[in-house]
Amino acid sequence: MSYYFKNIKPSYDDDSDEVSDEQDLDAILASKMRGRAESDDESSEEEDDGLSKLSFGSLKKAEDQLEEEERGELRKKRKPQHSKPINDEPEVRHKVYKEEEQEESDSESGSDDGAFFEEDERDNHSRPKNKNSKKRKHAPTEHSSKKRVSKIRDIPGLEIARQAKSGIYQDVRFTKATGEATDFSVIRRRYKFLDEYREKEIEEMERLLNDKKFVNKAESREIENMKEKVRSMKSRLQSVKNRELEQQIVKDYEGKLNEGNKNRFHLKKAEKRKVIQKWKFDHMKAKQREKVMERKRKKKLGKEFKQFEFHNR
Protein backbone atom coordinates (compact mmCIF):
# COMPACT_ATOMS: atom_id res chain seq x y z
CA MET A 1 0.00 0.00 0.00
CA SER A 2 1.12 3.54 -0.75
CA TYR A 3 1.81 6.25 1.77
CA TYR A 4 -1.48 7.95 0.96
CA PHE A 5 -3.70 4.99 1.80
CA LYS A 6 -1.81 4.27 5.00
CA ASN A 7 -2.64 7.75 6.45
CA ILE A 8 -6.39 7.69 5.65
CA LYS A 9 -8.59 7.70 8.74
CA PRO A 10 -12.35 7.04 8.88
CA SER A 11 -14.60 10.04 9.56
CA TYR A 12 -18.31 10.93 9.40
CA ASP A 13 -17.97 14.41 7.89
CA ASP A 14 -17.91 13.69 4.18
CA ASP A 15 -17.46 17.23 2.74
CA SER A 16 -14.66 18.36 4.98
CA ASP A 17 -12.95 15.02 4.58
CA GLU A 18 -13.05 15.23 0.78
CA VAL A 19 -11.33 18.65 0.75
CA SER A 20 -8.63 17.55 3.14
CA ASP A 21 -8.10 14.33 1.20
CA GLU A 22 -7.56 16.26 -2.04
CA GLN A 23 -4.99 18.53 -0.39
CA ASP A 24 -3.15 15.61 1.08
CA LEU A 25 -3.14 13.84 -2.31
CA ASP A 26 -1.65 16.87 -4.08
CA ALA A 27 1.07 17.17 -1.46
CA ILE A 28 1.95 13.49 -1.78
CA LEU A 29 2.11 13.65 -5.61
CA ALA A 30 4.38 16.71 -5.50
CA SER A 31 6.74 15.00 -3.09
CA LYS A 32 6.74 11.91 -5.31
CA MET A 33 7.72 13.96 -8.39
CA ARG A 34 10.59 15.54 -6.53
CA GLY A 35 11.74 12.12 -5.35
CA ARG A 36 11.66 10.74 -8.90
CA ALA A 37 13.79 13.58 -10.25
CA GLU A 38 16.36 12.96 -7.55
CA SER A 39 16.32 9.19 -8.07
CA ASP A 40 16.95 9.43 -11.89
CA ASP A 41 20.63 10.14 -11.26
CA GLU A 42 21.00 7.15 -9.00
CA SER A 43 19.06 4.73 -11.30
CA SER A 44 22.10 3.80 -13.40
CA GLU A 45 24.11 2.83 -10.33
CA GLU A 46 21.23 0.75 -8.98
CA GLU A 47 20.94 -1.15 -12.30
CA ASP A 48 24.64 -2.06 -12.16
CA ASP A 49 24.21 -3.28 -8.60
CA GLY A 50 21.34 -5.53 -9.73
CA LEU A 51 23.67 -8.03 -11.47
CA SER A 52 25.90 -8.29 -8.43
CA LYS A 53 22.92 -9.42 -6.35
CA LEU A 54 22.37 -12.46 -8.66
CA SER A 55 23.60 -15.86 -7.39
CA PHE A 56 26.42 -17.87 -8.99
CA GLY A 57 24.06 -20.70 -9.87
CA SER A 58 21.85 -18.47 -12.01
CA LEU A 59 24.92 -17.02 -13.77
CA LYS A 60 26.21 -20.55 -14.54
CA LYS A 61 22.83 -21.59 -15.95
CA ALA A 62 22.72 -18.52 -18.21
CA GLU A 63 26.28 -19.22 -19.40
CA ASP A 64 25.49 -22.89 -20.23
CA GLN A 65 22.37 -21.83 -22.11
CA LEU A 66 24.38 -19.39 -24.26
CA GLU A 67 26.97 -22.08 -25.07
CA GLU A 68 24.27 -24.56 -26.13
CA GLU A 69 22.74 -21.95 -28.44
CA GLU A 70 26.15 -21.24 -30.04
CA ARG A 71 26.82 -24.97 -30.61
CA GLY A 72 23.41 -25.39 -32.21
CA GLU A 73 24.13 -22.54 -34.64
CA LEU A 74 27.52 -24.06 -35.54
CA ARG A 75 25.95 -27.48 -36.20
CA LYS A 76 23.35 -25.94 -38.50
CA LYS A 77 26.10 -24.19 -40.47
CA ARG A 78 28.23 -27.34 -40.78
CA LYS A 79 25.41 -29.62 -41.99
CA PRO A 80 25.52 -28.63 -45.73
CA GLN A 81 29.29 -29.36 -45.98
CA HIS A 82 30.00 -32.79 -47.50
CA SER A 83 32.33 -34.87 -45.39
CA LYS A 84 35.42 -36.37 -47.07
CA PRO A 85 36.69 -40.00 -46.66
CA ILE A 86 38.25 -40.96 -43.34
CA ASN A 87 41.77 -41.30 -44.69
CA ASP A 88 41.84 -37.80 -46.19
CA GLU A 89 40.91 -35.65 -43.14
CA PRO A 90 43.06 -36.33 -40.06
CA GLU A 91 44.10 -32.67 -39.91
CA VAL A 92 40.47 -31.45 -40.23
CA ARG A 93 39.26 -33.59 -37.33
CA HIS A 94 42.10 -32.36 -35.16
CA LYS A 95 41.10 -28.79 -36.01
CA VAL A 96 37.44 -29.41 -35.07
CA TYR A 97 38.45 -30.82 -31.69
CA LYS A 98 40.53 -27.71 -31.05
CA GLU A 99 37.53 -25.52 -31.88
CA GLU A 100 35.26 -27.32 -29.41
CA GLU A 101 37.87 -27.06 -26.65
CA GLN A 102 38.22 -23.36 -27.30
CA GLU A 103 34.45 -22.86 -27.25
CA GLU A 104 34.17 -24.59 -23.88
CA SER A 105 37.03 -22.56 -22.38
CA ASP A 106 35.90 -19.16 -23.71
CA SER A 107 32.48 -18.45 -22.19
CA GLU A 108 32.19 -14.96 -23.68
CA SER A 109 32.93 -15.92 -27.31
CA GLY A 110 30.10 -14.98 -29.69
CA SER A 111 28.85 -16.18 -33.05
CA ASP A 112 31.65 -14.26 -34.82
CA ASP A 113 34.25 -16.64 -33.37
CA GLY A 114 32.31 -19.63 -34.67
CA ALA A 115 32.23 -18.17 -38.17
CA PHE A 116 35.99 -17.56 -38.01
CA PHE A 117 36.73 -21.20 -37.09
CA GLU A 118 34.33 -22.37 -39.77
CA GLU A 119 36.31 -20.46 -42.43
CA ASP A 120 39.54 -21.98 -41.09
CA GLU A 121 38.01 -25.44 -41.40
CA ARG A 122 37.03 -24.78 -45.03
CA ASP A 123 40.59 -23.72 -45.78
CA ASN A 124 41.84 -27.02 -44.36
CA HIS A 125 39.42 -28.93 -46.63
CA SER A 126 40.60 -27.07 -49.72
CA ARG A 127 44.30 -27.32 -48.82
CA PRO A 128 46.15 -29.75 -51.17
CA LYS A 129 48.04 -32.81 -49.93
CA ASN A 130 51.74 -32.70 -49.16
CA LYS A 131 53.81 -33.26 -52.34
CA ASN A 132 56.56 -35.06 -50.44
CA SER A 133 54.15 -37.69 -49.12
CA LYS A 134 55.22 -41.27 -49.87
CA LYS A 135 53.55 -42.73 -52.95
CA ARG A 136 52.27 -46.26 -53.22
CA LYS A 137 54.47 -48.86 -54.89
CA HIS A 138 51.89 -49.96 -57.47
CA ALA A 139 50.38 -46.52 -58.08
CA PRO A 140 50.05 -45.48 -61.76
CA THR A 141 52.64 -43.10 -63.15
CA GLU A 142 51.69 -39.43 -63.14
CA HIS A 143 52.53 -36.97 -65.92
CA SER A 144 51.99 -33.24 -66.03
CA SER A 145 48.88 -32.19 -67.96
CA LYS A 146 50.68 -29.02 -69.11
CA LYS A 147 53.16 -31.05 -71.17
CA ARG A 148 51.96 -32.27 -74.54
CA VAL A 149 51.93 -36.05 -75.07
CA SER A 150 54.44 -37.11 -77.72
CA LYS A 151 53.26 -39.13 -80.71
CA ILE A 152 56.15 -41.61 -80.37
CA ARG A 153 56.10 -42.97 -76.82
CA ASP A 154 58.91 -44.79 -75.04
CA ILE A 155 58.15 -48.43 -74.20
CA PRO A 156 60.00 -49.77 -71.14
CA GLY A 157 62.58 -52.32 -72.30
CA LEU A 158 62.58 -50.94 -75.86
CA GLU A 159 64.57 -47.73 -75.49
CA ILE A 160 65.17 -46.11 -78.87
CA ALA A 161 68.71 -44.99 -79.58
CA ARG A 162 69.47 -41.29 -80.07
CA GLN A 163 70.44 -41.89 -83.69
CA ALA A 164 67.04 -43.42 -84.44
CA LYS A 165 65.29 -40.45 -82.80
CA SER A 166 67.29 -37.99 -84.88
CA GLY A 167 66.02 -39.59 -88.12
CA ILE A 168 69.07 -41.74 -89.03
CA TYR A 169 68.18 -45.16 -90.42
CA GLN A 170 68.54 -48.10 -88.03
CA ASP A 171 68.78 -51.72 -89.15
CA VAL A 172 65.70 -53.57 -87.88
CA ARG A 173 67.66 -56.85 -87.67
CA PHE A 174 69.55 -55.57 -84.62
CA THR A 175 66.72 -53.96 -82.67
CA LYS A 176 65.34 -55.34 -79.41
CA ALA A 177 61.82 -55.42 -80.84
CA THR A 178 62.59 -58.63 -82.77
CA GLY A 179 63.52 -60.49 -79.58
CA GLU A 180 66.55 -61.04 -77.38
CA ALA A 181 69.94 -59.83 -78.59
CA THR A 182 71.82 -62.48 -80.58
CA ASP A 183 75.36 -63.45 -79.64
CA PHE A 184 78.12 -61.47 -81.40
CA SER A 185 79.80 -64.62 -82.69
CA VAL A 186 76.56 -65.73 -84.39
CA ILE A 187 76.05 -62.31 -86.00
CA ARG A 188 79.68 -62.24 -87.13
CA ARG A 189 79.39 -65.67 -88.74
CA ARG A 190 76.23 -64.65 -90.60
CA TYR A 191 77.52 -61.32 -91.98
CA LYS A 192 81.21 -62.04 -92.40
CA PHE A 193 80.89 -61.70 -96.17
CA LEU A 194 80.40 -57.93 -95.70
CA ASP A 195 84.12 -57.55 -94.95
CA GLU A 196 84.92 -58.14 -98.61
CA TYR A 197 82.60 -55.31 -99.68
CA ARG A 198 84.11 -52.99 -97.06
CA GLU A 199 87.66 -53.74 -98.22
CA LYS A 200 86.71 -53.10 -101.85
CA GLU A 201 85.08 -49.79 -100.88
CA ILE A 202 88.20 -48.71 -98.98
CA GLU A 203 90.42 -49.59 -101.95
CA GLU A 204 88.18 -47.62 -104.33
CA MET A 205 88.26 -44.52 -102.14
CA GLU A 206 92.05 -44.70 -101.72
CA ARG A 207 92.45 -44.99 -105.51
CA LEU A 208 90.37 -41.84 -106.00
CA LEU A 209 92.40 -39.95 -103.40
CA ASN A 210 95.64 -40.91 -105.17
CA ASP A 211 94.26 -39.77 -108.56
CA LYS A 212 95.62 -36.26 -109.25
CA LYS A 213 92.88 -35.36 -111.77
CA PHE A 214 90.15 -36.13 -109.26
CA VAL A 215 91.96 -34.21 -106.49
CA ASN A 216 92.32 -31.10 -108.69
CA LYS A 217 88.65 -31.13 -109.68
CA ALA A 218 87.18 -31.92 -106.25
CA GLU A 219 86.85 -29.37 -103.44
CA SER A 220 89.13 -29.46 -100.42
CA ARG A 221 86.20 -30.12 -98.05
CA GLU A 222 85.09 -33.14 -100.09
CA ILE A 223 88.61 -34.60 -100.05
CA GLU A 224 88.88 -34.16 -96.27
CA ASN A 225 85.55 -35.91 -95.77
CA MET A 226 86.70 -38.83 -97.92
CA LYS A 227 89.96 -39.17 -95.95
CA GLU A 228 88.05 -39.14 -92.67
CA LYS A 229 85.64 -41.77 -93.97
CA VAL A 230 88.52 -44.03 -95.08
CA ARG A 231 90.14 -43.78 -91.63
CA SER A 232 86.89 -44.59 -89.80
CA MET A 233 86.12 -47.56 -92.09
CA LYS A 234 89.62 -48.98 -91.61
CA SER A 235 89.45 -48.63 -87.82
CA ARG A 236 85.99 -50.25 -87.66
CA LEU A 237 87.08 -53.15 -89.84
CA GLN A 238 90.24 -53.64 -87.80
CA SER A 239 88.34 -53.53 -84.48
CA VAL A 240 85.88 -56.16 -85.74
CA LYS A 241 88.75 -58.41 -86.80
CA ASN A 242 90.56 -57.93 -83.47
CA ARG A 243 87.44 -58.81 -81.54
CA GLU A 244 86.98 -61.95 -83.62
CA LEU A 245 90.63 -62.89 -83.04
CA GLU A 246 90.31 -62.47 -79.25
CA GLN A 247 87.25 -64.70 -79.17
CA GLN A 248 89.10 -67.34 -81.17
CA ILE A 249 92.11 -67.20 -78.79
CA VAL A 250 89.90 -67.68 -75.71
CA LYS A 251 87.97 -70.47 -77.40
CA ASP A 252 91.17 -72.37 -78.26
CA TYR A 253 92.58 -71.92 -74.74
CA GLU A 254 89.36 -73.14 -73.08
CA GLY A 255 89.26 -76.08 -75.50
CA LYS A 256 92.73 -77.19 -74.35
CA LEU A 257 91.76 -76.81 -70.67
CA ASN A 258 88.54 -78.79 -71.03
CA GLU A 259 90.03 -81.76 -72.87
CA GLY A 260 88.77 -84.89 -71.15
CA ASN A 261 86.60 -82.96 -68.63
CA LYS A 262 82.93 -83.77 -68.22
CA ASN A 263 82.06 -80.26 -66.95
CA ARG A 264 83.29 -77.36 -69.07
CA PHE A 265 85.44 -74.71 -67.40
CA HIS A 266 85.04 -71.06 -68.50
CA LEU A 267 87.53 -68.27 -67.83
CA LYS A 268 86.68 -65.03 -66.04
CA LYS A 269 87.12 -61.65 -67.72
CA ALA A 270 90.43 -60.91 -65.98
CA GLU A 271 91.82 -64.31 -66.94
CA LYS A 272 90.65 -63.87 -70.53
CA ARG A 273 92.47 -60.53 -70.69
CA LYS A 274 95.72 -62.10 -69.47
CA VAL A 275 95.50 -64.97 -71.98
CA ILE A 276 94.92 -62.52 -74.87
CA GLN A 277 97.83 -60.28 -73.84
CA LYS A 278 100.19 -63.28 -73.57
CA TRP A 279 99.19 -64.58 -77.01
CA LYS A 280 99.68 -61.13 -78.62
CA PHE A 281 103.06 -60.67 -76.92
CA ASP A 282 104.26 -64.10 -78.09
CA HIS A 283 103.23 -63.43 -81.72
CA MET A 284 104.81 -59.95 -81.93
CA LYS A 285 107.97 -59.08 -83.81
CA ALA A 286 111.11 -57.93 -81.96
CA LYS A 287 110.59 -54.21 -82.71
CA GLN A 288 106.95 -54.35 -81.69
CA ARG A 289 107.91 -55.98 -78.40
CA GLU A 290 110.43 -53.25 -77.66
CA LYS A 291 107.82 -50.58 -78.31
CA VAL A 292 105.32 -52.30 -76.03
CA MET A 293 107.87 -52.71 -73.24
CA GLU A 294 108.93 -49.06 -73.55
CA ARG A 295 105.32 -47.92 -73.36
CA LYS A 296 104.71 -50.00 -70.24
CA ARG A 297 107.89 -48.72 -68.61
CA LYS A 298 106.88 -45.07 -69.16
CA LYS A 299 103.41 -45.77 -67.82
CA LYS A 300 104.84 -47.34 -64.66
CA LEU A 301 107.27 -44.43 -64.14
CA GLY A 302 104.43 -41.93 -64.49
CA LYS A 303 102.47 -43.66 -61.75
CA GLU A 304 105.52 -43.66 -59.45
CA PHE A 305 106.16 -39.94 -60.03
CA LYS A 306 102.55 -39.17 -59.20
CA GLN A 307 102.90 -41.04 -55.90
CA PHE A 308 106.08 -39.05 -55.03
CA GLU A 309 104.33 -35.75 -55.80
CA PHE A 310 101.47 -36.73 -53.52
CA HIS A 311 103.88 -37.44 -50.62
CA ASN A 312 105.80 -34.17 -51.16
CA ARG A 313 102.63 -32.10 -50.68
UniProtKB/Swiss-Prot annotation:
This is rRNA biogenesis protein RRP36. InterPro entries: RRP36 (IPR009292). The keyword Endoplasmic reticulum does not apply. The keyword Lipid biosynthesis does not apply. The gene is RRP36. It comes from the Eukaryota. Residues 85-99, 302-313 have a biased composition (Basic and acidic residues). It comes from Candida glabrata (strain ATCC 2001 / BCRC 20586 / JCM 3761 / NBRC 0622 / NRRL Y-65 / CBS 138). Residues 188-244 form a coiled coil. Belongs to the RRP36 family. Keywords: Coiled coil, Nucleus, Ribonucleoprotein, Ribosome biogenesis, rRNA processing. Residues 1-157, 287-313 are annotated as: Disordered.
